[in-house]
Amino acid sequence: MSPTYITQDIRNMLQVERDVMLSPPVSESDIRKWAIAVYWPDTPPRQFWDADYARNSRWGSIVAPHEFNPFAWPIERREATRLGGPIGKEPGQRVLNGGSTIRYYTPIRPGDVIRSGTKLVEAYEKTGRLGVMMFLISEIAWTNQRGERVKVEHKTSIRY
C-alpha cells in the first residue's frame, strides 16, 4: 500500500478560514503609484489616476488595477500557514506550484478596506511518475468593507 500524505491535520483544515488580514484604507495615491509602477514606462490608463476622467467612466470614480495588492507593503510581517508540514528533500516535503486561477469582481476604490481570508477547499492524491502526489487547493477571497466580493484566487500546491 502506498503512503498517504493527507493527514487528519489536513482534513481538519478543510473549509476552515485562516490567515485573515485587513488592509489599511486604500488611498488614491496608493492606486496611482501602483498603476505607475505596473505600466512603467508607459502612461497608465486614466481611470487609475485622473479623478475627473474616472468620474465620467463606467466606474464613476478612480478604481485600482486588477493586480493591485493592498497587502503588498505590510508594516509587520506575518508568517502564512504552511499546509502539509515542512519543506525539504524527503518524500512529502517537496513542493511544486500547481498554478492558480483568479476571478475579479467589484473593483477596489479609494477608501476601501480589504479583508483577505484563506481556506483549504480541496485535498486529494494522485500517483504519477514522481510517486504519490498530494494536491492542495487553497482559496484566497478578498471582500471590501461592504462585504462585496473583490477577488477570489484558487492556488494549487503539489507535495510529493
Name the predicted role of every residue range.
Residues 1-99:
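Hot-dog-fold acyl-thioester-processing enzymes
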Residues 1-15, 99, 103-160:
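HotDog/MaoC-like acyl-thioester-processing domains
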